[in-house]
């Protein structure tokens, strides 16, 4: 029967286990860190901290470019460490404890708790929390094992190379990423919505944002000056299409400023042809990004929209295109509507609008039972004190902020925002 290990042997065993446990801890943390590292985050760190020439930076760059080899190195190291710890403990316990069953159980429990809990679960959690710090701090040690196991990792990488095709980043991936940033509080709902709209900006077609021809205010080339002036004054548009009555084609646009300047200078012999701006033609199937570029190149604020049969079906302005990104734009000449849609989940609402009409249509069906109560009285009934003092109200379904009219402070509007997780 073997005698119990001597003090020196016991010291060597303990130190060996501590060293192996440390190695396992490092590579486990490194595995999570290298997996969690994103290229943009790493590049930002290098640029911000001026670490381009550091050896650790070059090592981490190499690991990113040879991710499979790095991961194989970590897995091999971890498995070897686990086997060595288990064998060392088995030999030590076998010499110390006479009962083989008890020795095996203690070996399993000690090595299992030590390796799984303290050398894998805990370091992996810390590696995910401190990604860059972990990578930089232990780059040299992991690279040491990378060199030791290079023949194995190289051979394995060559075998796996034909199966290793990195998946391209899709729009859906970017959407998930934006949603995650929004949930972490770095983006507001409006910011994330704007970015998402920017991503699909080149997919939106002109026919979605154009003004249909039946809603367009226009004049004929042979209309009287007074009639055209009346059109401008009534419609409050800065530009107007001019149509040739003979061909029924748009021959150009006139600008309000040019028209009234010429009218004042020479009202009797004003020639409309001299005021015309050339027509920019776009197809209804044209992406708005391309239409915007075409309008900018031609320095045109408006474009005529034709269908595939070259029939004029509407017009589109730069404002229409920009509103697709930022939401509805109202200027000082627009009439104040009872309900102004600023975005798909944001509205400006007058106090006298019926609460049932607005909330049941846009927030949630059957939210308001009474058909006669106004929004002003409905909101006041929800929370009198805080709403009256702070001019703000927050509910599980929506939030409200009181907006004073810029010209008349006694007039107010309610900015109502629907919560993103509410389904109408």
Curated annotation (Swiss-Prot):
Annotated InterPro entries: CBS_dom, CBS_dom_sf, CNNM, Ion_transp-like_CBS
Domain CNNM transmembrane: 6-191
Pfam family of the protein (one): CBS
Membrane topology: Multi-pass membrane protein
Location within or outside the cell: Cell membrane
Family, per entry: Belongs to the UPF0053 family.
Domain named CBS: residues: 210-270, 272-332
Alphabetical list of PROSITE patterns matching this protein: CBS (PS51371), CNNM (PS51846)
One Gene Ontology cellular component: plasma membrane
SMART domains attached to this UniProt entry: CBS
Keywords (A to Z) from UniProt: CBS domain, Cell membrane, Membrane, Repeat, Transmembrane, Transmembrane helix
Protein name, as recorded: UPF0053 protein MG146
TM spans (from-to): 7-27, 71-91, 101-121, 135-155
């Amino acid at each position: 029967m073997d005698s119990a290990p001597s003090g020196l042997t016991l010291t060597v065993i303990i130190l060996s286990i501590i060293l192996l446990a440390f190695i396992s801890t490092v590579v486990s943390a490194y595995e999570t860190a290298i997996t969690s590292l994103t290229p943009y985050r790493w590049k930002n760190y290098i640029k911000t901290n001026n670490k381009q020439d550091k050896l650790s930076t070059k090592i981490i760059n190499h690991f990113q470019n040879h991710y499979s080899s790095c991961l194989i190195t970590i897995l091999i190291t971890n498995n070897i460490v686990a086997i060595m710890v288990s064998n060392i403990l088995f030999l030590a316990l076998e010499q110390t404890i006479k009962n083989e069953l008890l020795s095996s159980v203690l070996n399993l429990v000690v090595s299992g708790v030590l390796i799984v809990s303290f050398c894998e679960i805990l370091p992996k959690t810390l590696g995910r929390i401190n990604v860059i710090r972990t990578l930089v701090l232990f780059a040299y040690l992991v690279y040491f094992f990378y060199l030791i196991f290079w023949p194995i990792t190289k051979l394995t990488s060559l075998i796996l190379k034909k199966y290793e095709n990195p998946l391209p980043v899709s729009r859906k991936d970017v959407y998930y990423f934006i949603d995650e940033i929004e949930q972490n509080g770095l983006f507001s709902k409006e910011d994330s919505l704007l970015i998402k709209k920017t991503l699909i900006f080149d997919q939106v077609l002109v026919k979605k944002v154009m003004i249909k021809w039946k809603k367009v205010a226009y004049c004929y080339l042979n209309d009287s000056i007074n009639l055209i002036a009346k059109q401008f004054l009534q419609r409050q548009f800065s530009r107007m299409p001019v149509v040739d009555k003979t061909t029924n084609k748009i021959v150009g646009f006139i600008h309000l400023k040019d028209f009234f300047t010429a009218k004042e200078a020479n009202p009797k012999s004003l020639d409309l042809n001299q005021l015309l701006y050339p027509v920019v033609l776009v197809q209804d199937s044209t992406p708005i990004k391309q239409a915007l570029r075409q309008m900018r190149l031609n320095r045109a604020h408006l474009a005529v929209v034709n269908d595939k049969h070259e029939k004029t079906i509407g017009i589109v302005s730069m404002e229409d295109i920009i509103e697709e990104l930022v939401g509805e734009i109202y200027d000082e000449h627009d009439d104040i509507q009872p309900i102004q849609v600023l975005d798909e989940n944001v509205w400006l609402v007058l106090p006298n609008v019926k609460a049932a009409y607005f909330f049941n249509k846009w927030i949630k069906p059957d939210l308001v039972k009474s058909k006669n109560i106004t929004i002003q009285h409905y909101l006041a009934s929800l929370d009198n004190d805080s709403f009256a003092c702070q001019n703000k109200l927050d509910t599980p379904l929506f939030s409200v902020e009181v907006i004073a009219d810029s010209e008349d402070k006694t007039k107010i509007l309610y900015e109502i925002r629907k919560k993103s997780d509410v389904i109408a």
